[in-house]
Amino acid sequence: MTTATSGLKVKIGDPIPSVGQRATDGYLLNLRSLVGKKSLILVFFGGPTFKGAARERGDAMAEALKEAYPRLEKQGVALIGVTTDNEQQQKAYVAELGLPYLLFSDERRIAVEVLGIPTTTERGNTNAEPTAFAVSIDGTILDIVESAAPKGLVARLLEAIFPPG
């Protein structure tokens, strides 16, 4: 049985909340710690505990972000991926896909709860639905993409950070 939740608790124009997370490399980071330093693309997606088509969607997102990472780095934009898997599962996932960006574990779903990220529970595993945020250097949420699909996502978020003209 699959169940879903929804209801974002933040909106465009809000400050990114203060939420601490641990990356697969053990690095601890509060989302607010980048304020004043870098713009941020923050993407929640289903990770290694999903199976079948849901896993394929998560893998596609991880790979799309991997492809975009050099461009983001060149433009001075931080990229953080977040799944609700534990650190051990994520370490294997990062190694398997060769992900160059920080992937944070929200196993206790603290960030998911604070931001109101939709989740899906399947076979006892609760995973974040694909949701992406563009955050300005001053910490303001510039864009939110719910049910985010990999194609065109990074371009849309970069346009929010660096508007044309």
Mark where each language-model region is.
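Chalcogenol-based redox active-site neighborhoods
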Residues: M1-G165
